[in-house]
Amino acid sequence: MELELQRRCAESTFRSRHAAVIYRGKRVLVYGVNRNKTHPYCSYYGKNPEAIYLHAELDAIVKVLNSEGAKTLKGATIAVCRTTRDGRYADSRPCEGCQRAIEAFGLKVEYTTKEGWTE
């Protein structure tokens, strides 16, 4: 799962390369990446209601909502990864808006720092 997150970060065309995975136990539910795509949750949870991008966390949450529903999210874990252009870990603590969404849907969160993973 960790290598897959790094691979998905590397595919990003953004300066900040983020990917997220939502999982329960050893079962991966969905991956998300930051992208040029909007969703109503961008304005609801984001700082900028006119944003034209979707954070990796919200991308993953929306995918689960569309495929399996909100009940699937409660108690699952979201892991958020950011890598630099040369593949090193970077700080990927969810922003204030994404953190509100994570809490609203009852997810546990893990993310990368420059030193690696934290919980």
Predicted regions and their residues:
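Zinc-dependent deaminase catalytic domain
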Residues: 1-119
